[in-house]
């Protein structure tokens, strides 16, 4: 039996209610395996997902749907010391990042 995380898509419904991703540059902090990233990336302009865990980033990169190849990038980075210039993103997403 396969366990489905959030089969009702509650997470993405809440995110879309509070943020308009259409054409936006999005930074997802603590992107993990990319499970949530893919759900909004189709409408975003560009998504950069960062995480500290290389195993999760590897899964996110390998499992990335091919239609999102040119829109989603993953990098190992610490949210305390972001390796980006100011105002690089329009929206920041922190979901389940402790």
Task: Describe the residue ranges of each PLM region.
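A short, aliphatic-rich alpha-helical micro-motif
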Residues: 20-21, 41, 86
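A short acidic, Gly/Pro-enriched loop at the edge of an enzyme's catalytic core
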Residues: 80-92
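Conserved acidic residues
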Residues: 24, 45, 90
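Conserved alpha-helix/loop element of class I SAM-dependent methyltransferases that forms part
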Residues: 5-24
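A short beta-strand submotif of the Rossmann-like class I SAM-dependent methyltransferase core
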Residues: 94-97
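Class I SAM-dependent methyltransferase SAM/SAH-binding core
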Residues: 27, 33-82
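N-terminal, positively charged/glycine-rich alpha-helical extensions of SAM-dependent methyltransferases
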Residues: 1-3
């Amino acid at each position: 039996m396969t366990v489905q995380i959030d089969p009702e898509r509650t997470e993405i419904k809440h995110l879309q209610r509070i943020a308009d991703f259409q054409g936006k540059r999005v930074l997802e902090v603590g992107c993990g395996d990319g499970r949530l990233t893919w759900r909004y990336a189709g409408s975003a302009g560009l998504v950069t997902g960062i995480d500290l865990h290389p195993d999760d980033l590897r899964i996110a990169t390998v499992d990335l749907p091919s239609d999102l190849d040119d829109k989603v990038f993953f990098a190992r980075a610490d949210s305390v010391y972001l390796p980006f210039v100011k105002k690089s993103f329009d929206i920041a997403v922190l979901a389940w990042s402790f």
